[in-house]
């Protein structure tokens, strides 16, 4: 598959390399500190901090369709027992046929287009964005006072609050119209129970569009 730095997460689209796994991070932090000397030997040191971190990681998602990852074990020569089939797959990897050894974006768009033509606009393949946003605040204040040559006092207070928001959004429908907010793994085990496959029981069979939240959405408060 070319050099030893093989990366299965990209493929060609419109003559350009497109990566399915893209990580973006934005992490601004503000810190304020105030020192007050009331008198000799007495110091009050107070500080506050605010941090707001945005983190996202994209990935392919699919439902009722072949695994689009080129390094999926069923696409490797070692998966097949038939020697002729093994040789054919070895040749594809050896010659680095990028339509096979890399993500085939054209096939993903085509699968969604065929679904639309069949009267179903739901995405077979899509690109999701996994978000992990963090809000963190802290406050502390420390008093140091010398009462005498042999007696010092140190006292302090501190507080901290953290909220982590975890959710997924639809980054790119790859030509589809929407994605159904259902659990594809639960659908395999409980196909006869429509309630068990829903990600949101309050909104069953919900259609989610680009930039919409789906799958999971919860906060961690510390």
Feature map (PLM): residue ranges:
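Glycine- and small hydrophobic-enriched segments that form the cores of compact globular domains
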Residues: 167-222
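Small-side-chain secondary-structure face that scaffolds active or pore-lining regions
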Residues: 70-82, 86, 164-183
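Generic detector of intrinsically disordered, low-complexity, polar/charged segments
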Residues: 8, 12, 44-46, 116-118, ...
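Outer-membrane beta-barrel transmembrane strands
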Residues: 14-59, 122-160, 165-166, 208-222
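Acidic/polar loop-and-plug regions of large Gram-negative outer-membrane beta-barrel proteins
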Residues: 1-33, 56-128, 192-206
């Amino acid at each position: 598959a070319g050099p030893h730095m093989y990366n299965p997460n990209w493929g060609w689209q419109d003559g350009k390399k497109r990566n399915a796994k893209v990580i973006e991070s934005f992490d601004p932090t503000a810190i304020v500190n105030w020192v007050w000397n009331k008198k000799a030997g007495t110091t009050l040191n107070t500080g506050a901090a605010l941090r707001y971190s945005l983190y996202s990681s994209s990935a392919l998602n699919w439902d009722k369709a072949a695994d689009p990852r080129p390094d999926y074990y069923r696409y490797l020569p070692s998966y097949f027992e038939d020697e002729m089939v093994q040789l054919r797959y070895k040749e594809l990897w050896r010659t680095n046929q990028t339509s096979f050894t890399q993500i085939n974006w054209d096939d993903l768009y085509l699968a969604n287009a065929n679904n639309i033509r069949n009267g179903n606009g739901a995405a077979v393949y899509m690109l999701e964005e996994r978000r992990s946003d963090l809000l963190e605040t802290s406050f502390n204040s420390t008093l140091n006072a010398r009462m005498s040559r042999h007696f010092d006092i140190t006292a302090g207070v501190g507080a901290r609050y953290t909220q982590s928001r975890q959710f997924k959004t639809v980054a790119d429908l790859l030509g589809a119209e929407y994605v159904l907010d259902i659990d594809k793994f639960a659908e395999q085990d409980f196909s006869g129970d429509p309630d068990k496959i829903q990600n949101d029981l309050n909104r069953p069979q919900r259609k989610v569009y680009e930039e919409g939240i789906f799958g999971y959405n919860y906060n961690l408060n510390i």
